[in-house]
Amino acid sequence: MKRFFLTFIIFFSLVYAYANTIVIQGEIIDKKSGIPLSGVNVSTSNNKAQKTITGLNGSFTLKVESLPVELTINYVGYKTLKYIVNKQNNNTIVIEATVEDLKEVQVNSSLEKNNDILARNIEKNAASISNIVSAKAIELSPDFNVANVIQRISGVTLERTSNGDAQYATLRGMDKRYNYTLVNGIKIPSPDNKNRFIPLDIFPSDMLARLEVTKSLTADMEGDGIGGAINMVMKDAPSVKSFSINTSTGYNSLYIDRQFLSYNKDAVNLKSPFESYSNLYAAKPRDFANGLTKITSNKPAPNFFINSSFGNRIFRKKLGYMVGLSYQNSFRGGDITNYGSSISTSDASNLPVVTGKSDRTFSDQQSRLGVHGKLDYIISEKNKIQWYNAYLDFKNHQIRDTRGVDYSIGYDPSNGNYNVSYSTRFRYTHQNIYNSTVIGDHLLMNSKIKFDWTLAYSKAFNEIPENTTVNTVSTVRNNIENQVSVVTLGGQSVRWEHNTDEDVSGKFNFISTVNLNKGTLEIATGGLYRDKQRANFFNEYDLRPFDDNKAVGQKNNLIKGVDWKDYSEIKFTVYNPYGSTGDPLNYNASEIITAGYLQTKLLKENFQLNTGVRVENTNQGYNLLNPVAGVKNIGEQVYTDVLPSIHLKYLLNENKNLRVSYSRSINRPSFFEIVPYKIINEEFTEMGNPDLKHTVADNFDIRYEIFPKPAEQFLIGIFYKNINNPIETGIVDQGQRSFFTPTNFGIAKNYGLELDITKYFFNFGIKFNYTYTNSSITTSKVYYELNTDPNSSVRNVLKTGSQTRQLNGQAANLANLTFIYKNIKNIIDFQIAAVYTGDKLFAVSRFLNNDTWQSSFVQLDASLEKKVKKATLFIKSNNLLNTPVSLYFKKYNKVNETISGYEKFNNGTLLRKDLNGINIQLGFKFKI
């Protein structure tokens, strides 16, 4: 009874105490900017035990015994404030920085440069429609390169490599060819051997101050971005001395269950025999017998990433510098199931027929090196000059090992009879980009005119030397595999490729501001000149098995275990000793762009009107290094475009905008598309098109924007693009022949909706975006039809028709959801991010209604950080679900049900399934 009575008294006392506790709520903001501050210490003046910390949105809650109560507000870089609270809710407390310039506030402040608040502010005040990812958001995300970062932006889908790495970006359902990439506002060249798009995985994410994606172009921007423009703004010199280092190690789960295959990297010949000697040199077997094809199998070393930066301002803060270094060495790969297919011709059903299955393992060791440095010198209050240099280097050593089963000839699984093929590819890819940019900023005529200029030199390089593939075959009878022998025709191919893309460019802008009644008028004009020179080299040798010591009739029959044990022991003869330097991939290309613009920006109390016109002249040409009879061996295209734009931003109130935009933009043919090449295949000849026209598009946008708090946003918008002369690959009939060639196909339409939401609570935050995209384009295709001529021995004939479909590379539905948790007291940051990509048109087929689709999938990534004094421990993981990426036809053929183990996929025909493993990195960061 006493125990019960005591428990009752304690319980009653607690209830009474709680009932007499008052919970006060408030928000801490910066006096100068009005920005909410997170991590501010709040306590009662007479009882320091009663304390709390403001959350991500600057809010706080605190239990006190009575009102009024005096609070003490402490925050690094700010004056300590005593504040008396008289009410429970809606307490807005303003604190003032201890220094006049908020840029001097130390890193502990939420006003740190390159954070989400700055990113939202840029989006809010931008002249056109854009999305920004800040350096702070990148740092806390699970991403290590720019390609992975950009997938978090609405309207962006990614094209991935065989090892699962994101590489190219598609903006608003427009293929990668329809956007361009900038570094600090300067377009950079491409290392691709045929096209002008940039592989974004070559850029380490830790070098960025922010990533900008502009979706509607203004007149002062280059005009060839129908999808948009990607701008990587690199880190500036800090206002105070700073040093940071970040290192991590990790592993890919793929190699827990299997070995990593590698080869002797030093054995790769960077030059072909043609280049090493002369064009008259006949290559010999000894020129290829260098041990490259000897395979080593083991467990890979852990991944190793490191990046560091150092910067300061010296000479009375006039000279600023920032030097950054990033290096990543990782082991990636893929386990891929691939089904070969053809089109059913015997019954003219045009349904897909599965002809074989191959199991491929990819083993990739890749390294990324990034070095960048930036100097800026403040000559005076009116003059400043900057010099930026960057060198980016990417290397990938890959073995692709394939085992294939033929379903079309000799396939009898019930008796254990079928034919087997083996293929192993040894490939080294090396790409680098160098950029050097000088920028000047000046105020003229008593600061009435702003003048800036830019001079830039950039060079991109790509090489794939001694790309070697070895092919062998065998048979299985009664479930027992017979001896493996080298393929007689095409036993080994060895290929050398390299290309350079070199740019010299300059641009300038004059901006004058005129004060009006209750507003201002900004008038800008400028120009651009770029000279691009591109060189391309390709050479391939065909090696065939031959052992002169064997008996007549057996010299080409080289058997594994008898004549050789590993690939390096196979004896070959060179079938084409002079290589294939006559290949159309040997060409030079040039492009000269001259542009000028006039732009006005009217700013009144509640609206901003940006109008302008840009004129761009293009002179694009090519020169075949090996002349071909009957074609244009030298050609050029010269044209001028007038590109108007108008962007209206109506300010509904301080935190709400309504935007309406129109712009005209273009897309130029890629370098190789206008070269008159011909590549003969079994059924079709691929052909270049010197008469290919450039694409012109009219782009319309409407977006409604709300910025409830400085780091929060709600954006919803629609877009529409009317695309004239879109470039797609299709069938063109010439006489009795059909050619697969890049062609202009009339008019295409592309439209969609984008939604972006960012919301922060006390310790939590949510970022969500969704994009719906649809399009329509009609292109020519071929199909088989039963022959109605009774006198003909041909059962079916090939016809040309047309198909209306969406644009290549487009997914109708995209979504991103990121959940953010921040424990301010214990300095812990956690993120889990999901990316959903709906069914995407992956590749366009020559055949009617037989395009390849990528199935919808979800990728899940996560990151966790814990700060300990000046160091931060972190873990980042990608592809946590090890989500398979599958390709398929939407058609299904019951004939395929006779194949042992083959199943339907999404009521269609499975073509490929990729598994790339889970990547996990553990590391630490240190900043001073």
Model-derived features: where do they sit?
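Surface-exposed extracellular loop regions of Gram-negative outer-membrane beta-barrel proteins
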Residues: 187, 533, 560-576, 619, ...
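Short acidic/polar hinge/loop motifs at secondary-structure boundaries
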Residues: 61-63, 186-215, 235, 260-262
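Outer-membrane beta-barrel signature, preferentially recognizing the C-terminal barrel domain
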Residues: 415-439, 581-594, 666-723, 733-760, ...
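Gram-negative outer-membrane beta-barrel transporters
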Residues: 719-722, 741-844
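Transmembrane beta-barrel wall of Gram-negative outer-membrane proteins
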Residues: 291-400, 644-646
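Extracytoplasmic beta-strand/coil segments of soluble accessory domains associated
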Residues: 147-187, 228-229
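C-terminal beta-signal and adjacent terminal beta-strands/loops
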Residues: 836-843, 866-928
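Short, acidic, small-residue-rich periplasmic hinge/interaction motif at the N-terminus
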Residues: 29-33, 41-45, 74-78, 90-139, ...
